[in-house]
């Protein structure tokens, strides 16, 4: 076992698995606005946000918590008026109806402008707040909370190194020389007291799932499953429970519920996808606390490992790759070993590779539930010795190589897909 990797694994999970209130792309805009206002003398009169095409795509149609509205203008406005900068991805946790009303007044008066920035950064937001002749601009780039620069009245008062330069990644990546086998060994053998923090993911995302099951949010996918179980059109059981509880959390998340998700790799839906299927299987099997914690760690770290091969935002749906983390945790809980997990991930790549990301919105919950369903299917197949082999499509002879192939697709030809998606979205 490569125990020398373990501290790095713990650090990356603590960094990438964090609470987030609301979809993280509009929240990053709200955070930039909140930071800017802290340095502004006077009342905010005007807000301008310039964002990368990918951030625009993911912010156009998603609910902003506590506002009853969707999109980047309300995120920028309410972040400026009432955001708590030190709360990071929970920047909007204490907004009030009065704050939202104030934000709407700014928007209705034409004082909030959002546009696309001509930048190479995949994740980028520059928010400028103005009061009279004074202005403050805050730039967040490369990750959802990484402040790249602060400018006050034309003077740059802070500048940071990019969060994902080649040198910084090489220095900080815990996955140098790591394989899926090393993640498996870590999750199963690391001291429990060093990884038990991951249990908080189950607590937050299960609470979000319960909120979604009330049927008040989005497309009500989780609640739809529940209603049809009650009607007798669907049976209960493991598959239905995974779909129901996982989709419900995403329903609530994407329609602006005032409950945080535990995110993964900067995404609440990815955190939900990596958490809820594992929680449901653990509940179904009535396993003990330690086994649940180890399965959650296996899931979340595998999801981060897969995502580390890809751009932070891309045309490839992140719920699909996060669910490949979930299949690792589920397969292990159901009695599978590393070989079975390997095969299950390969089957998922053979099943759902290439599902596009066309922005954050309520219908993301459908992709989350589809990915969770693929995870259940692939886990059960693997336990019976059935899987997609390296003779088929982009799937290789092992999960590590298959992940690299999937990521080559995401980082290569799908970059043009991303351009086409945004063009369709802004011109339809």
From Swiss-Prot:
Superkingdom: Bacteria
GO molecular function: L-cysteine desulfhydrase activity
Biological process annotations from GO: L-cysteine catabolic process to pyruvate
Annotated InterPro entries: Ser_deHydtase-like_asu, UPF0597
Organism: Photobacterium profundum (strain SS9)
Family: Belongs to the UPF0597 family.
Disulfide bond entries: none
One Pfam family recorded for the sequence: SDH_alpha
This protein's name: UPF0597 protein PBPRB0240
